[in-house]
Curated annotation (Swiss-Prot):
Example GO molecular function: magnesium ion binding
Name this protein carries in UniProt: Adenylosuccinate synthetase isozyme 1
Reactions catalysed according to its record: IMP + L-aspartate + GTP = N(6)-(1,2-dicarboxyethyl)-AMP + GDP + phosphate + 2 H(+)
Enzyme Commission designation: 6.3.4.4
Binding site for substrate: 43, 331-337
InterPro entries reported in the protein's UniProt record: Adenylosuccin_syn_GTP-bd, Adenylosuccin_syn_Lys_AS, Adenylosuccinate_synth_dom1, Adenylosuccinate_synth_dom2, Adenylosuccinate_synth_dom3, Adenylosuccinate_synthetase, AdSS_1_vert, P-loop_NTPase
Record HAMAP family: Adenylosucc_synth, Adenylosucc_synth_vert_basic
Enzyme class: ligase
Organism: Homo sapiens (Human)
Length: 457
């Protein structure tokens, strides 16, 4: 019956497709992405969890941040460092996608790729797709990042401790609507050059000591434009096709972490993007119903780079031991990380914002030598227990942490490959975390390699 329809097929005036509710929902939703996010102040071992999940992923994407993130992945004894490239680029069967929420320093991107090529990374350009809406980080953004830190030091006697990669200044340009994007670089270059010059002059008027080789930078950018042109796609259409075409496994690799989020982190000592789950939707251009599992990555203790409140910090032998045993210095900056006990107030707060479906607890083996292990379970302010994580930094500096002391296991866990291999006290520690946060631990990390991530379910 082409072109005609029985009148009782549908109510008068109804158009479109008639389906049952469940089919409608499935058709409308499409595939769901799996998200890996940091649940503390970064450096939790997200790269390792991504690496595990990336082995059978079809697409691995980054949705925010820039080359201020640092992910280390060890494969076949080789250590790869990723900052801007999704760490899933190692997987030769998958496509890596840099979303619109990421800010891209092109010289940094190629430098990073070349460094990893020397370690054995091959054909990455054929597997990388870049959103045309991603903003560009220019060399002068990086210079300004350094100048702003000097200013803060002079004015307030303290700085934020940025990575000086130009991330904050680029997101500032984006919010001020003066930034330039990949799509601008790839269209009319004269128009791009004129906007680039305006942006450079604006920064020079704010920072009189700032020197910018405008012509030199434009020449380099023109060269980079041709190199990246084959990799650039409209990110919205790319993600839509990926979600609604043949079923695909899509993995999103969060950079930074919950407590560094521009809205929910320990402001102002945060990064300039949303590194909580909302940043996935805005940074890739996908709706909330396409978010599937959200895995929170947590270190078995707490670390923080740079300044800012850190309630469970241990400036003592314990802190020193955690730093030495855990090799706690930054991948991007080489700075020493401050160390302290696991803080469950932070973890519960990160769960409220992100809605974790499961946790990965990493670096459990670092606690192997301790006779007892403390865990921060609540905060007191002026002698009264407070049921929330304070937004105000001065208040957070003043909180007194209430600890629970658990027995240590004093045994080497690095050889453990199953739950049963872990000492009862280590199992008890993991169950304690689960019960207090209300989220199951899916993986436990006891070493550097892929094999040392014990999967519990």
């Amino acid at each position: 019956m082409s072109g005609t329809r029985a009148s009782n097929d549908r109510p008068p005036g109804a158009g479109g497709v008639k389906r049952g509710r469940l089919q409608q929902e499935a058709a409308a939703t499409g595939s769901r992405v799996t998200v890996v996010l940091g649940a503390q102040w970064g450096d939790e071992g997200k790269g390792k969890v991504v690496d595990l999940l990336a082995t059978d992923a079809d697409i691995i994407s980054r949705c925010q941040g820039g080359n201020n993130a640092g992910h280390t992945v060890v494969v076949d004894g080789k250590e790869y460092d990723f900052h801007l490239l999704p760490s899933g680029i190692i997987n030769t069967k998958a496509v890596s996608f840099i979303g619109n929420g990421v800010v891209i320093h092109l010289p940094g991107l190629f430098e990073e790729a070349e460094k990893n090529e020397k370690k054995g990374l091959k054909d990455w350009e054929k597997r990388l797709i870049i959103s045309d809406r991603a903003h560009l980080v220019f060399d002068f953004h990086q210079a300004v990042d350094g100048l702003q830190e000097v200013q803060r030091q002079a004015q307030e006697g303290k700085n934020i401790g940025t990575t000086k990669k130009g991330i904050g200044p680029t997101y500032s340009s984006k919010a001020a609507r003066t930034g330039l994007r990949i799509c601008d670089l790839l269209s009319d270059f004269d128009e791009f050059s004129s906007r680039f010059k305006n942006l450079a002059h604006q920064h020079q008027s704010m920072f009189p000591t700032l020197e910018i080789d405008i012509e030199g930078q434009l020449k380099r950018l023109k060269g980079f434009a041709e190199r990246i042109r084959p990799m650039v796609r409209d990110g919205v259409y790319f993600m839509y096709e990926a979600l609604h075409g043949p079923p695909k496994k899509i993995l999103v690799e969060g950079a930074n972490a919950a407590l560094l989020d521009i809205d929910f982190g320990t402001y102002p000592f945060v990064t300039s993007s949303n590194c909580t789950v909302g940043g996935v939707c805005t940074g890739l251009g996908i709706p909330p119903q396409n978010i599937g599992d959200v895995y929170g990555v947590v270190k078995a203790y707490t670390t923080r780079v740079g300044i800012g409140a850190f309630p469970t910090e241990q400036i003592n032998e314990i802190g020193g031991l955690l730093q030495t045993r855990g090799h706690e210095w930054g991948v991007t900056t080489g700075r020493k990380r401050r160390c302290g006990w696991l803080d469950l107030m932070i973890l519960r707060y990160a769960h409220m914002v992100n809605g974790f479906t499961a946790l990965a607890l990493t670096k459990l083996d670092i606690l192997d030598v301790l006779g007892e292990v403390k865990v921060g379970v609540s905060y007191k302010l002026n002698g009264k227990r407070i049921p929330y994580f304070p937004a105000n930094q001065e208040m957070l500096q003043k909180v007194e942490v209430e600890y629970e002391t658990l027995p240590g296991w004093k045994a080497d866990t690095t050889g453990a490959r199953r739950w049963e291999d872990l000492p009862p006290q280590a199992q008890n520690y993991i169950r304690f975390v689960e019960n207090h946060v209300g989220v199951a631990v899916k993986w436990v990390g006891v070493g550097k390699s892929r094999e040392s991530m014990i999967q519990l379910f």
